[in-house]
Amino acid sequence: MRLWFCLSFFVVLCLEHFPGTLADERNNRDYPIRTHLHGPHIPRNNRDYPIRTHLHGHHIPRNVPESEEKTEQFLRDLSEISRLQRRPPGFTPFRGKFHSQSLRDLSEISRLQRRPPGFTPFRGKFHSQSLRDMYEIKGFKSAHGRPRVCPPGEQCPIWVG
């Protein structure tokens, strides 16, 4: 995998250095140009020459390819489409188990529907009741179904149960 990546990177690097290939397409040039390392270029006293190739190759884009125009048009259309279409009330772009309704809709639903007394949105072994309910229930229930050994006023040791 690493060898394949290195080879493809090397090929792209080589293509960038030949005129009339990737580098020219990327910089929107319709003519070959060479920088100061790789041969002659148009002399500096020509001031309307738009490309400075000395260090970083800053340039004024000549002709913007129509693919970019199409992209801009596509983005404009997309925003219009999203404004025109109304989404159903339970819909959000999030997917998965807990995002079938948006969080705001979930709170509205939970206000509208009455839940059973021991129910909370937490899941798992220790959240079948909320912690406060567990504490209140613990005061009234006997420990694990066995009767209490200690009288109600005294402190029970942990091992008696």
UniProtKB/Swiss-Prot annotation:
Residues 1-23 form the signal peptide. The keyword 4Fe-4S does not apply. One of its GO terms (biological process) is negative regulation of blood pressure. It comes from Bombina orientalis (Oriental fire-bellied toad). This is Kininogen-2. Keywords: Amidation, Amphibian defense peptide, Bradykinin receptor impairing toxin, Disulfide bond, G-protein coupled receptor impairing toxin, Repeat, Secreted, Signal, Toxin. Pfam families: Bradykinin. It is found in: Secreted. The lineage of its organism: Eukaryota, Metazoa, Chordata, Craniata, Vertebrata. GO terms for molecular function: hormone activity; toxin activity. Disulfide bonds join 150-156. Expressed by the skin glands. Its main location: secreted. InterPro entries: Bradykinin (IPR009608). One of its GO terms (cellular component) is extracellular region. Belongs to the bradykinin-related peptide family. The modification Valine amide is found at residue 160.
